[in-house]
Each structure stands twice: as structure tokens, then as C-alpha cells.
Amino acid sequence: MLVIAHRGASFERPENTLPAFERAIELGADFVELDVWRGTVVTHDPPVQGRRYPTLAEVVELCRGRIGLMVELKRPRAGDVARTLELLEDDAVLVSFNRPALVQSRALRPGIRTVQHVGFGVSIRGARDAWAAGFYDARVTVRGVAAARALDLVPLVYTVNEPARMRELERLGVAGVFTDRPDLARQL
């Protein structure tokens, strides 16, 4: 099962920070997932003026050759997708609830892998051009996982922190979990 460190090792370190990403690397996660605003600022919520945030360029440099990157586009505006793609290497994965942003990313960089979150206004069929479908844990079903697999989508679930639930999802055919606890997920 793919272990995707949700905002880094956010159970142990402040989320979306360089120490959280470094810790995820130490714990052996397959990917770090991070949130990006306006294409370059790493934060889950809208940036607050005067506060220091890591930049996407800093995170790319930290992770290069050490761990995979999944970059979630938060409320992308015109130009945000292009700015984000300029900073990412070809093996990065873009994630979003925003289907048009992912369509645009694939047009700008054919072959880039994308994760379309489903269930909040986007159906499994709406994710058909993505690499993976991201399901919210409380809404994932056997039928949804099967539908994703039938469309050759990699089924991923967020945010799962209990080992028993991780094992259950693996039995359902889920390929990976976004987790605040990559330490526990790696032990499975």
C-alpha cells in the first residue's frame, strides 16, 4: 500500500513545514502530500500576510530524489497551474478537487500524473482522465473502489490514521492512504 504523508508527518511535526516533510522522509513514506496556494506558497489555508511559509521550490529541493511529491492545488486561479508546474519535476503528482485545474495541468504537461478527489461534485467518471481517484474515508465504498479500478484509476483514500482501518481499506482494494501517521502505515 502506498503511504502518502498528509502534509508531511503532521502527527509529529507542524503540518506543511520542512520539518514535517523531512520526518516523512525519515519514516519511509512513499510520498509527501502538501497544499499550495497561488502556485508557490505551501499552506492548507489562505496565506496570512506577515507569516513565513515554505515555498514550493524549497520543498521540491528538500524532497528531490528522496521521496515522491503530491501537490494539492488549493482554489487555483488563472496562472496558478502553470506557476506550479514550472517548479515541479516530471515525477510529481498534482492533486485537486478542481477538475478544470487538473485538465489544464495535463494539457500543459502531458503525462503528468493527477489525483482527482471524487465525491464532492466530481464523479468517478469525472476522474477518468486522472491517474488516481481520491476518496474521502467516510465516503469510500466497495462499489466506488471497484468503479475506480474499472476505469484504470488508482484508488486512494484520505485521511486515514488508524492501522485497523488501513488494513480494511487494503482488503477493499485501495492502493494507498493519505495519513498523518506514516509511521503506523509503514508498519503494516
Model feature map: region roles:
Residues M1-L188:
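Phosphate-group recognition and catalysis centered on beta-loop-alpha active-site segments
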